[in-house]
């Protein structure tokens, strides 16, 4: 004789319980109403370093960092100019997501200051996950800006590309067109 045990979900749909029992789930029978399935107890520890790198890599092509609005002289202004100047907003947003810094930023200098206060250390050779700061370049009419992004390995980095207005993968030194000024590393990423 085969006993087939079925549960019933909240919408009244029946489902077999046997396979769940074989996988280690517990079943609580409720008279004539339904059965509750409880996941077996597991110890789950988030892998922050790998998740951080995955978020950086998965951010490629994302337009969520394109606009950052502020009131400038009482007027609503997109201070990132539709993604042209979004590098610090992008990098600080990702870092803040993992509590690697204290707050989000709109400038490279304020992001670097927060990184240093938050325990990031200067290193000579980039490690996967390190934050890279590139030298200032002239955007137009004497409008000089530094640049910031993430090192992902194999001489590759991800940063907000001004011409695109969103993060993209590129050569670490933009094919020797931009010098690295500073590399910062967080010991928590080991």
Where are the regions that the model predicts?
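Active-site or metal-binding loop neighborhoods of secreted/extracellular toxin and effector enzymes
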Residues: 157-190
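Short Gly/Ser/Thr- and charged-rich N-terminal loops/segments
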Residues: 1, 19-27
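Acidic/polar hotspots within intrinsically disordered regions
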Residues: 6-9, 25
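N-terminal secretion targeting segments of exported proteins
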Residues: 23, 31-46, 188-190
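N-terminal capping segments
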Residues: 36-104
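...with weaker cross-activation on analogous glycine-rich loops/strands in unrelated enzymes
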Residues: 103-169
């Amino acid at each position: 004789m085969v006993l087939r045990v079925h549960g019933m979900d909240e919408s009244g749909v029946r489902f077999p319980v046997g396979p769940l029992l074989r996988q280690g789930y517990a079943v609580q029978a409720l008279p004539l109403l339904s059965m509750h399935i409880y996941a077996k107890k597991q110890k789950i520890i988030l892998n922050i370093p790998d998740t951080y790198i995955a978020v950086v890599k998965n951010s490629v092509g994302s337009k969520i960092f394109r606009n950052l609005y502020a009131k400038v002289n009482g007027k609503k202004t997109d201070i990132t100019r539709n993604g042209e100047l979004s590098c610090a907003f992008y990098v600080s947003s990702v870092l803040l997501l993992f509590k690697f810094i204290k707050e989000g930023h709109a400038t490279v200098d304020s992001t670097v200051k927060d990184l240093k206060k938050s325990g990031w250390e200067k290193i000579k050779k980039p490690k996967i996950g390190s934050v890279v700061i590139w030298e200032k370049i002239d955007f137009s009419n004497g409008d000089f800006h530094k640049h910031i992004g993430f090192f992902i390995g194999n001489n590759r980095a991800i940063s907000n590309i001004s011409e695109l207005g969103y993060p993209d993968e590129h050569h670490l030194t933009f094919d020797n067109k931009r010098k690295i000024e500073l590399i910062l590393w967080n010991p928590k990423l080991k």
